[in-house]
Swiss-Prot record:
PANTHER family: NON-SPECIFIC SERINE_THREONINE PROTEIN KINASE (PTHR45832:SF9), SERINE/THREONINE-PROTEIN KINASE SAMKA-RELATED-RELATED (PTHR45832). Belongs to the protein kinase superfamily. STE Ser/Thr protein kinase family. STE20 subfamily. ATP binds at residues 329-337, 352. GO terms for cellular component: cytoplasm. Inhibited by INKA1; which inhibits the serine/threonine-protein kinase activity by binding PAK4 in a substrate-like manner. The modification Phosphothreonine is found at residues 187, 207. It comes from the Eukaryota. This is Serine/threonine-protein kinase PAK 4. Residues 238-258, 267-280 have a biased composition (Low complexity). Disruption phenotype: Mice die at embryonic day 11.5 probably due to a defect in the fetal heart. They show strong defects in neuronal development and axonal outgrowth. Spinal cord motor neurons and interneurons failed to differentiate and migrate to their proper position. Nervous system-specific conditional PAK4 deletion mice display growth retardation and die prematurely. It comes from Mus musculus (Mouse). Keywords: Apoptosis, ATP-binding, Cell cycle, Cytoplasm, Kinase, Methylation, Nucleotide-binding, Phosphoprotein, Serine/threonine-protein kinase, Transferase, Ubl conjugation.
Length: 593
């Protein structure tokens, strides 16, 4: 009855304790310092939306700034082995912007300017990819993105500030974590996701002509990818073997081996598809490797030369002479976004600041200026001016107080009147852009910004491409993983149809709150997009027949059968579109949460 009390177990203090980690907060930089590498991607205030992937054809060795969120692999997987790629994925770095270079990236071997757009012609010899950064999480904006990584819901819900913060309103620091662009250290080639044994036969887009109308993909060491006659690259998608027997098709694609360059070695890579397809008729013959050197070692464009070229398309002067009170509201895939006040009128504007020395592909900065300047439309964000301030490109544009559509799709539920209103505005902008040969390549909710009265505007033109009669298709891997079209992932030549697929994914986003496969790592999601049937709505029972029919016209695997923007503007579903004011209640609902 009066038994002894059990003796309380005493736990000693830790022995041999060492203080190895000291974390602090830099008030000037407004960021944590000394964080363990594993924590950096969890606690940074920067956005966690997927960023867009950028074609890895000219990734060079870099020294990134603060880790961001675009995923790049350190090397391409050999023989398309899924195991190798997934092992490599464990060691990828994660950056949330276009890698924020401390040095300028390699210049394009041959560049052209058409309708104000500058695009890389061919990939220069590559340097070793960046090895810095933390382990890649399955995230990917966007970039991306942007890239990139993933927005899988781990820990507190953090949806990354979209690389598309653009001129939108301030984004919360804490948002659902979106996988990461599309986008942003060597981009993994999503095609190498599968074992190199098969590519499902009968896929309509797989019969696409393999003309090399964009710069050819190259291996991590600057070596041309081995191509199957009608299929993707060996490091891309599922070439059955990597033996020398597959080399001739490689040369047919415009990436000849050293011995078969011949007199056309110096021609631009935008030769018409007919020439590229006719190449196999010439049997491969051994030859001296000498003629290859000019293509492998193009003359580098210095930072000063690039800056001088950019100076030709921007406005003279310094915006700080008439702008005050710069306040950072977000971080995008290529730089930061601030709001500023016009001294004379007190009007708020958005200013996107992009450091020339911290870009993965500098030439894409021309898109930021040229597209918004030359293709003005009521559903495209209006650009006021652009300037070179030191080594930064500043783009001054309208400030959209409503923020990004991402906030609405994440935290509210849209009805079909509101979904149709967004689709109508986006399609009106795309119809104009596509008619001019401009492909956006990063359509998603992060790229859609809203005015205070509910008007919808398309933004983020930094990853655009131009097609024309001379260059009818593109082949760069650019976009945000979950929104990418199957043919783009498969590295097949593509055109404006990829924007239509991405819009279809965005419709699913507006209905379900997230894109398909969003709980999967980006590489796995890209494999599923490439190999599976078109994704379906989770809440299919909530969709009307007209919405289902509209979605069926967007998400068609065969790009030739996919509807165009002009055709979709006549679809019955868009007759449901409400006025811009119908979007306002959603913005209010989001603000009151």
């Amino acid at each position: 009855m009066f038994g002894k009390k059990k003796k309380r177990v005493e736990i000693s203090a830790p022995s041999n304790f060492e203080h190895r980690v000291h974390t602090g907060f830099d008030q000037h930089e407004q960021k944590f310092t000394g964080l363990p590498r594993q924590w950096q991607s969890l606690i940074e205030e920067s956005a966690r939306r997927p960023k867009p992937l950028i074609d890895p054809a000219c990734i060079t060795s870099i020294q990134p700034g603060a880790p961001k969120t675009i995923v790049r692999g350190s090397k391409g997987a050999k023989d398309g082995a899924l195991t190798l790629l997934l092992d490599e994925f464990e060691n990828m770095s994660v950056t949330r912007s276009n890698s924020l270079r401390r040095e300028s990236p390699p210049p394009p071997a041959r560049a052209h300017q058409e309708n104000g757009m500058l695009e890389e012609r061919a990939a220069p010899a590559r340097m070793a990819p960046d090895k810095a950064g933390s382990r890649a999480r399955a995230t990917g904006h966007s970039e991306a993105g942007s890239g990139s990584g993933d927005r899988r819901r781990v820990g507190p819900e953090k949806r990354p500030k979209s690389s598309r913060d653009g001129p939108g309103g301030p984004q919360e620091a804490s948002r659902d974590k979106r996988p990461l662009s599309g986008p942003d250290v060597s981009t993994p080639q999503p095609g190498s996701l599968t074992s190199g044994t098969k590519l499902a036969a009968g896929r309509p887009f797989n019969t696409y002509p393999r003309a090399d109308t964009d710069h050819p993909p190259r291996g991590a060491q600057g070596e041309p990818h081995t191509m199957a006659p009608n299929g993707p690259s060996a490091t891309g998608l599922a070439a059955p073997q990597s033996s020398s027997s597959s080399r001739p098709p490689t040369r047919a694609r415009g990436a000849p081996s050293p011995g078969v360059l011949g007199p056309h070695a110096s021609e631009p890579q935008l030769a018409p598809p007919a020439r590229a397809l006719a190449a196999p008729a010439v049997p491969p013959a051994p030859g001296p490797p000498g003629p290859r050197s000019p293509q492998r070692e193009p003359q580098r464009v210095s930072h000063e030369q690039f800056r001088a070229a950019l100076q030709l398309v921007v406005d003279p002067g310094d915006p700080r002479s008439y702008l005050d009170n710069f306040i950072k509201i977000g971080e995008g895939s290529t730089g930061i976004v601030c709001i500023a006040t016009v001294r004379s009128s007190g009007k708020l504007v958005a200013v996107k600041k992009m450091d020339l020395r911290k870009q993965q592909r500098r030439e894409l900065l021309f898109n930021e200026v040229v597209i918004m300047r030359d293709y003005r439309h009521e559903n495209v964000v209006e650009m006021y001016n652009s300037y070179l301030v030191g080594d930064e490109l500043w783009v001054v544009m309208e400030f959209l107080e409503g923020g990004a559509l991402t906030d609405i799709v994440t935290h509210t539920r849209m009805n079909e009147e509101q979904i149709a209103a967004v689709c109508l505005a986006v399609l009106q902008a795309l119809a104009v852009l596509h008619a001019q040969g401009v492909i956006h390549r990063d359509i998603k909710s992060d790229s859609i910004l809203l005015t205070h009265d509910g008007r919808v505007k398309l933004s983020d033109f930094g990853f655009c491409a131009q097609v024309s009669k001379e260059v009818p298709r593109r082949k760069s891997l650019v976009g945000t993983p979950y929104w990418m079209a199957p043919e783009l992932i498969s590295r097949l030549p593509y055109g404006p149809e990829v924007d239509i697929w991405s819009l279809g994914v965005m419709v699913i986003e507006m209905v379900d709150g997230e894109p398909p496969y969003f709980n999967e790592p980006p590489l796995k999601a890209m494999k599923m997009i490439r190999d599976n049937l078109p994704p379906r709505l989770k809440n299919l029972h909530k969709a009307s027949p007209s919405l289902k029919g509209f979605l069926d016209r967007l998400l068609v695997r065969d790009p030739a059968q996919r509807a165009t923007a002009a055709e979709l503007l006549k679809h019955p579903f868009l007759t449901k579109a409400g006025p811009p004011a119908s979007i306002v209640p959603l913005m209010r609902q989001h603000r009151t949460r």
